[in-house]
Amino acid sequence: MPTEIPDPRLTEVADNVFAYIQPDGTWFLNNTGFLRGERGVTVIDQCGTEARARRFQETVARTCEPPVQTLINTHHHADHTFGNFVAPPHATIVAHRKARDEVIATGTSIAAAFEGPDWGDIEIVPPFLCFEDRLTLFVDDLECQLIHFGTPAHTTND
């Protein structure tokens, strides 16, 4: 497995909506994104290692003047939540209640099962604003619906 972090690609897919694409190369690569508002940024998922999460956070900071206000975890898997700890301390971390429960129950145990990633000094920071069925949040005038459909898909909590 390569140990270097592949160069990610940042694409503005709509006005103030960005996709952060990490190319294949090792375990625990995921795609993230963020929504830029006038008063703050909403991040969708984090990265799975400390170095990748910090790199993503630096990209957000370079791209957006307002700070990260909200971090949404789409589900509990490590490639979406291990980097939560690099979010600004004032950021609200949002997810379905089951995602929070799984982040806490799983902790960093998955890291031992995979060779290759340099995890860094991961600190588990679970979501602390949770919803059961749906949650509406706004980034300026953009209405964002977080919906749990009640049936397992990729996980029980996405």
Where are these regions (language model features)?
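Conserved beta-strand hairpin/beta-sheet module of binuclear metal-dependent hydrolase folds
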Residues: 10-59
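Short Gly/Pro-enriched turn/cap motifs at secondary-structure boundaries
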Residues: 23-24, 119-122, 126-128, 148-152
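Active-site flanking residues adjacent to catalytic metal/cofactor-binding acidic residues
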Residues: 44, 74, 157
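Active-site HxH/HxHxD metal-binding segment of metal-dependent hydrolases
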Residues: 51-54, 58-130, 134-136
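Core dinuclear metal-dependent hydrolase active-site scaffold
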Residues: 134-158
